[in-house]
Design a protein with these regions (language model features):
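Aromatic-lined substrate-binding rim segments of carbohydrate-active enzymes
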Residues: 2-76, 142-144
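Active-site region of glycoside hydrolase catalytic domains
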Residues: 47, 51-59, 64-144
Length: 144
């Protein structure tokens, strides 16, 4: 794994924090098939960040960025009937809740208040509110 080397270089460059995307489609490539092993081991990464003395701003999406395939939304979501991506849509939010249960279940143990490196969590990213029918409801649902 290159993580230790990369984190050491970041620390040597006098940084004290990093922000990290946690792509949903990387950890659930097929519906219900979760993978947090090997290079996808979030807990191991957070342990290394802590050992390097770096704080972490966690960015689990559900959408992380336009540079990542589908913004990290799993491809298996797209054909779901009645599902509206990145909306206050019960079906979409049900899938997001499963993702959040997995990823936030890991991140909560690494909160700064518990001695871990995670100083914050950003929900969603690059949200274009022009396309969001219920902005307040969507962000509120992610938060809750």
């Amino acid at each position: 794994m290159l993580w230790s080397d990369r984190l050491a270089k970041v620390k040597a460059a006098k940084y004290n924090a990093i922000d990290v995307y946690f792509p949903w489609n990387y950890h659930e490539p097929r519906e219900g098939c979760w993978d947090f092993s090997g290079e996808k081991d979030v807990a191991a990464f957070l342990d290394l960040a802590s050992e390097a003395g770096l704080r972490v701003l966690a960015r689990p999406g559900p959408y992380i960025c336009s540079e990542w395939d589908g913004g990290a939304l799993p491809a298996w979501l797209y054909p779901k009937s009645g599902l509206e991506l990145r909306q206050n849509n019960e079906l979409f939010l049900g899938y997001v809740e499963k993702w959040y249960q997995k990823i936030l279940g890991i991140l909560k143990d690494y909160q700064f208040s518990k001695g871990g490196p995670v100083i914050g969590v950003q929900l969603d990213n690059e949200l274009d509110f022009f396309d969001c029918h219920d902005r307040v409801g969507y962000i509120g649902a992610l938060r809750d």
